[in-house]
From Swiss-Prot:
One of its GO terms (cellular component) is plasma membrane. The gene is sorT. It holds the Pfam family MFS_1. Belongs to the major facilitator superfamily. Sugar transporter (TC 2.A.1.1) family. This is Major facilitator-type transporter sorT. It is found in: Membrane. It is a multi-pass membrane protein. Residues 1-21 are annotated as: Disordered. PROSITE patterns: MFS. Major facilitator-type transporter; part of the gene cluster that mediates the biosynthesis of sorbicillinoids, a diverse group of yellow secondary metabolites that restrict growth of competing pathogenic fungi but not of bacteria. Disruption phenotype: The production of sorbicillinoids shifts mostly towards tetrahydrobisvertinolon.
Length: 522
């Protein structure tokens, strides 16, 4: 007669009574707490409408933050009058906000606000309150130093939704279902900076630059309140940890979460050390991560370069007003939307067929990036060389659309490629890419004005076009030789081996379960 381990009944109100946990409830053999099948405490088992509503709020937060970063860029003339500053000093206000996107996560690691330890909900509450406070203060600034410092701190806290919202979506949807949600989420950081100047231009022209900041405060504040009210904690490890505490308090026995059992209890110092140093290890020691990050950073930097370039091209050279000048971004915005539609179509028609046939590998993500890699320089060169007074203004705006189209089709597949390649290390890899592109996005606007005034519109716009042209072969090369390269890189090889072992374990477990069913039926 085989010995059967005692199991703990679940009675927390989060899962149905009758579900059982393995273990004995002792120090040597604690009950192992994990999500059960159809467990309502697992965010992945929530209703589709609820999950999509939460995902929409999380994505809207990313859009609001990036919208705020660029809406400021069209207020130059009014800020000049109020503070008597140069163009270069004004642009620092844009750059510092974007630089905060890179610095923010490192700061939180030091002060202990990490979602791995405390969950995502507390980060949402603290960072949105802080953004509203700092942006509200910047709207009332009486000198330029206060304006710049407060925008930097607003950007520092604004970096939280850029990282945390993607994690929230991953908490809600299993990999096979999260493609559409992540596609829309990944477009928000590019659509926000493009639409910010359009709205900001008309607000600045009508009621002044302080109300541009005020509108952003209201926008972020409303989104923050929506999140506080409607987004509960979604991070699985934290939810399981809370459940272990509830169960232990209820009956006095020993419970540990399945992750703590498998990985050990994480000390805050260990989490902080990993958060601070691991992204840099991947960035500088993994060629795939470095090249992909450089490519994405050039695109991201070019998006923010346009914040300084568009006023020169259309306001200075063509004499447009601040409000009308913001409409020049519509061409790129339309391109981004078309890129989103293409990405969704490609995922549903091509990639999901490969996934269903179990023939998808990380390189299967890259064909759209090959198309986008061609569209990027076409859009940039077309924008650069159709901006003559003799050519109608609509031509350059329309021809900037391929750049927006290419942004989505390069960034999204490359991010998915990095996730599929590094799997267990994906969070650190994406953090490395995000930090690098945020730094580049902060630097590009600093030299935009001088570059356009010294080189002229055509050659200044051609420089990022040449950079994207140099990067164009990367998706094609990785599509052809990516598997061989991955096997030669330390961490991508480790990730592949780990996933292979996990799949073997799952197969073995499934086989054992089938045998047990057959035995019991006999």
């Amino acid at each position: 007669m085989s010995h059967t381990e005692p199991k703990a009944p679940v009675n927390t109100g989060e899962v149905e009574n009758g579900h059982l946990y393995d273990g004995s409830g002792t120090e040597d053999d604690p009950f192992i707490v994990e999500f059960q099948k159809d467990d309502p405490g697992n965010p992945m088992n929530w209703g589709q409408s609820r999950k999509w509503f939460i995902a929409a709020i999380a994505t809207l937060s990313v859009f609001a933050v990036t919208f705020t970063s660029s809406a400021y860029s069209v207020s130059a003339n009014e800020v000049f009058k109020d503070f008597d500053i140069s163009t270069e000093v004004f642009i620092v206000g844009l750059s510092l906000f974007v630089l905060g996107f890179a610095i923010g996560p490192a700061v939180w690691a030091n002060i202990g606000l990490r979602s791995e330890l405390y969950g995502r909900q507390i980060l949402w509450i603290i960072t949105h309150i802080a953004m509203v406070a700092f942006l509200g203060g910047s709207a009332g600034s009486q000198n330029v130093a206060t304006l710049l410092i407060l925008r930097f701190f607003a950007g520092t806290f604004g970096g939280s939704p850029l990282v945390n919202s993607g994690g929230t979506i991953a908490d809600l949807f299993p990999p096979a279902q999260r493609g559409l949600a992540l596609t829309i989420y990944c477009v928000a950081p590019f659509l926000g900076p493009i639409l910010g100047p359009i709205v900001g231009g008309f607000v600045s022209e009508s009621v002044g630059w302080r109300w541009v900041q005020g509108v952003c405060v209201i926008f972020i504040g409303v989104v923050g309140i929506l999140g506080i009210v409607f987004i509960p904690e979604t991070y699985g490890p934290v939810l399981l940890q809370r459940r272990t505490h509830q169960l232990a308090k209820a009956d006095g026995k020993i419970y540990v979460s399945v992750l703590e059992k498998n990985q050990g209890k994480k000390l805050p110092s260990e989490v902080f050390k990993r958060a601070l140093f691991r992204p840099w290890i991947f960035l500088f020691l993994e060629p795939i991560v470095l090249i992909a990050s450089v490519y994405m950073a050039i695109i991201y930097g070019t998006v923010y370069m346009f914040m300084g370039a568009m006023p020169i091209v259309y306001n200075e050279d063509r004499g447009w007003s601040v409000g009308i000048g913001g409409l020049a971004f519509l061409g790129i915005a339309v391109g981004i939307i078309f890129g989103l539609v293409y990405a969704i179509w490609d995922n549903n028609v091509r990639y999901m067929k490969l996934f269903a046939a179990k023939s998808a590998n990380p390189e299967s993500r890259l064909p759209p990036a090959i198309v986008g890699g061609v569209a990027l320089p076409i859009g940039m060169f077309a924008f650069a060389w159709t901006n003559y007074p003799s050519i109608h203004w609509s031509v350059s705006i329309i021809l900037s659309a391929p750049f927006g189209f290419g942004c989505v089709l390069v960034i999204l597949p490359i991010m998915n490629y990095l996730i599929d390649t590094y799997t267990i290390y994906a969070a650190s890899v994406l953090a490395a890419a995000a930090i690098f592109r945020s730094v580049v996005g902060a630097v590009f606007p600093l030299f935009t004005t001088q570059m356009y005034h010294n080189l002229g519109i055509h050659w200044a716009s051609s420089i990022p076009a040449f950079l994207t042209l140099l990067c164009m072969p990367f998706p094609l090369i990785m599509y052809r030789y990516g598997e061989a390269v991955r096997m030669k890189c330390k961490y991508s090889f480790e990730a592949a081996e780990m996933m292979r072992k996990m799949q073997l374990q799952q197969t073995a477990a499934a086989t054992t379960t089938e045998k047990d069913k057959d035995s019991s039926s006999e």
